[in-house]
Amino acid sequence: REAAGKRNIGSLIENAVNELDSLDKMSRLERPSQYGNTVQERLFNVALELSITWMNRILFMKLLEAQLIKYHKGNTQYEFLNTDKIQSYDDLNSLFFKVLARKLEDRGVTTKEFFDRVPYLNSSLFEPTELEHTTLFVSNLGDSRLLPIYIATLLKDSNGKRRTGKMNPLQYMF
């Protein structure tokens, strides 16, 4: 973990650490010592476990999205991991639990219309974990935090030049 003055609050881990700490979620853990010896170790390790869970879901969805587009001969209407559909961590949380974890007929009207081409996945990956129930869901993360763009990024701006500065982590991922 970076030193206190060098941490990127826009990263999933640091965003989660901040929310875990400010909401005093560590006090809800049954055995906090399993996550480390100090408060800082525990905060980091819980945030790391949550971040890994969230990133595993995102990676799976990215692979699913690519397969759907390929199966439907490049039809971009099957894209669902983009900032047109996912503008906040609340939207991402909805995709996890109100879309992928529910059959089409069990989804709410708005969710059904917005994600009508996203299939139901009968997978435990899209069920809340015990740690999420006890601490944070991805929807608890702060949406306004920015992440510095990696200096050797392959991302380009509208002029074809390498992007610099900061951007929203969801835009960065999608």
Spell out what each predicted region is.
Residues 1-174:
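Preference for the N-terminal adenyl/adenosyl cofactor-binding alpha/beta module
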